[in-house]
Amino acid sequence: RLAMKGYSITIFDSKKKLGGLNEYGIAAYKSLENFAERETKFVLSIGGIEHKLNSTLGKDITLEELQNDYDAVFLGLGLSGVNHLRLEGENSEAIDDAVNYIEDLRQSQNLADLPVGRKVVVIGGGMTAIDMAVQIKKLGSEEVTIVYRRGQKDMSASIEEQQNAQNNGVLIRHWSKPSKLLINEKTVNGVEFEYTENKNGKLVATGEKFSIKADMVFRAIGQTFESSIDNLPKLENGRILVDNNYKTTVSGIWAGGDCVKDGEDLTVSAVEAGKIAANSIHNELVS
């Protein structure tokens, strides 16, 4: 939008390709071939847009440098961190993040190079958990189980997506939380779970446990905003605070998408935030 108004734009991206979640985070079974690449090529064809890849904010370039070199800065940082289960052995090779596997799959030139477990457990209740489970089932896993600590209606994944997973052979178990990774010499053999229940609005463990055998375990319990970058604008609830025009508390800096307070995990919402911020930037620069 700003390029169409005649501004010279520079995009910095930490990855080797543009496209963000559309390129790296959407399961392959949901995406058309090279759709993200085609979309970015269309945007770049507008003209006046330079892009610099493998450029990580806070490592390869600082926020202060961007402020000095450009009239306005828009931060679309997404959520690069992941939540952890806080279980013993979690930092070993026995468990992986679903987002990492989906990224590897999307960028793989040969699917035969990807590990595919025979029995797979996915821990979580959102769209990433569903995508991970359906994707690896389609790749050939014999048994895939999603385990979520609350009930079906509490899952952030829609009922339709849950049903789609089940139609693809994925088992979904509710009211269970992981209590122990079953590991033998860095090799995962399964996960021990404890049944949960809702008591007076609080999730409590019942003390009764069970185990699911698995040779691959994936974590899909949400992502977090990595806020270790120097001189970031003010945060609230762990994300960047913005006004209705997506302007931050720091003059000359706007932000949008998942990295801002109340940001939604939706591409269309991030695009809308970018449009609103672009108009705000233009209005401020011409005033």
Set out the residue ranges of the language-model regions:
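N-terminal Rossmann-like FAD-binding beta1-loop-alpha1 element of flavoenzymes
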Residues: 1-11, 128-137
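Rossmann-like dinucleotide-binding cores of NAD(P)H-dependent redox enzymes
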Residues: 11, 15-45, 52, 133-180
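Residue-level detector of alpha-helix initiation sites
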Residues: 17, 126-128, 260-261
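Feature captures the FAD/FMN-dependent oxidoreductase FAD-binding
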Residues: 37-88, 180-192, 216-218, 224-226
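Glycine-rich dinucleotide-binding loop and its adjacent helix/turn
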Residues: 41-59, 82-139, 236-249
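FAD-site-proximal beta/loop scaffold in flavoenzymes
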Residues: 91-117, 201-265
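A conserved FAD-binding loop/helix module that cradles the flavin
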Residues: 132, 259-287
